[in-house]
């Protein structure tokens, strides 16, 4: 049966030997196209290889269990909502008991939990090296095995380089955090200023009132859309449900760039307002802060610290702690185990903080800032008529107290 099938295939194409002799590049593909043998079902070497791969996968899964658990806790902490500080929180922040509070919360800190894999690994390496050196010193091993020891002079010379590398790495991450914070300060200030200009410039009557209400909703929706754009796992449909209407929300959800779609809603609404050119140009100029905010946020999200710098810091730390027990053996002996533990916990903690704040937006209280913008706009709308009527009443009272010729009435 298989011979007949192979003959039928060969009859429609050039002979295999002739094709391979003239065009060797087609030989592999041709063999694959006419491979009509049924799959093997016997328990031969292939089944042993698959069983070996299964054991390897299980071993890899076992070794990755603790790092995956630590990463899951860290990512869960990144998605927690931050809150703005109040006076009570600042008092607690300055409290003399803060060190005790920070110490007691160590086991729930995602920074410390993320240090478990590297610190445990390097401490285990220190235990292995200390055990080996002790076995050699006690003649438990043949004399050909040397004691792993070295001079501490190379470490004394390279320690300042490692310290500077960690400092510069953390400082670069903090600069990104500070840049993201300033960008959002400008976004919130620009949003509030644009809303204030709309409230003051647009009449609250007729069609203008409808457009004004929609425009203020779009302005309040912009920081929410940008927040969902820069924070992974945000639910923009839930966050915007109470701000804008359902048909507008569906259009925003279909857009590839949702913050710019909200800006387009704002621009079109401004164009529909019956304003003179000066006021319209003023409102358009206020939107420059929103465009700049989008640019800065996308730059921070898409361009990390140069990867060569991050990798250099990581490799330096790894090689440093792999050889640290060898360097300290002559002076510390078994004390190299706690010394390696303390060194790894300290230095990797500094590096971990730099990695966490490199992405600044999960560290900021963006949800509360967006809620603050919404509440500020609502308060400004409610107080607009009250303040306007009060000022008009004061003007009328002032005119009533003065005569037509400018003399004050006694």
Curated annotation (Swiss-Prot):
Topology with respect to the bilayer: Multi-pass membrane protein
Protein name: Voltage-dependent chloride channel 1, chloroplastic
GO cellular component: chloride channel complex; chloroplast; chloroplast stromal thylakoid; chloroplast thylakoid membrane; thylakoid membrane
Keywords, sorted A to Z: Chloride, Chloride channel, Chloroplast, Ion channel, Ion transport, Membrane, Plastid, Thylakoid, Transit peptide, Transmembrane, Transmembrane helix, Transport
InterPro entries: Bestrophin-like (IPR021134), VCCN1/2 (IPR024701), YneE/VCCN1/2-like (IPR044669)
Subcellular location: Plastid, Chloroplast thylakoid membrane
TM annotation in the entry: 111-131, 148-168, 316-336, 337-357
GO biological process: photosynthesis, light reaction; regulation of photosynthesis, light reaction; thylakoid membrane organization
Regulation: More active at positive than at negative voltages. Repressed by the general anion channel inhibitors dithiocyanatostilbene-2,20-disulphonic acid (DIDS) and niflumic acid.
Keyword Repressor in record: no
Entry superkingdom: Eukaryota
Record family assignment: Belongs to the anion channel-forming bestrophin (TC 1.A.46) family. Voltage-dependent chloride channel subfamily.
Acyltransferase as UniProt keyword: no
Residue numbers on the Lumenal, thylakoid membrane side: 1-110, 169-315, 358-410
Topological domains annotated Stromal: 132-147
Its job: Voltage-dependent chloride (Cl) channel critical for proton motive force (PMF) partitioning across the thylakoid membrane by anion influx into the lumen during illumination, thus being required for photoprotection under fluctuating light conditions. Influences thylakoid ultrastructure, including lumen size and organization.
Catalytic activity: chloride(in) = chloride(out)
Phenotype of null mutants: No visible phenotype except stronger photoinhibition when grown in the field. Slightly reduced proton gradient (delta-pH) but increased electric potential (delta-Psi) across the thylakoid membrane leading to moderately elevated proton motive force (PMF). Transiently decreased non-photochemical quenching (NPQ) during the dark-to-light transition. Slower NPQ induction on transition from low to high light. Wider thylakoid lumen thickness, loosely stacked grana and disorganized stroma thylakoid system.
Species: Arabidopsis thaliana (Mouse-ear cress)
GO molecular-function terms, A-Z: voltage-gated chloride channel activity
Source lineage: Eukaryota, Viridiplantae, Streptophyta, Embryophyta, Tracheophyta
Tissue expr: Mostly expressed in flowers and leaves and, to a lower extent, in stems and roots.
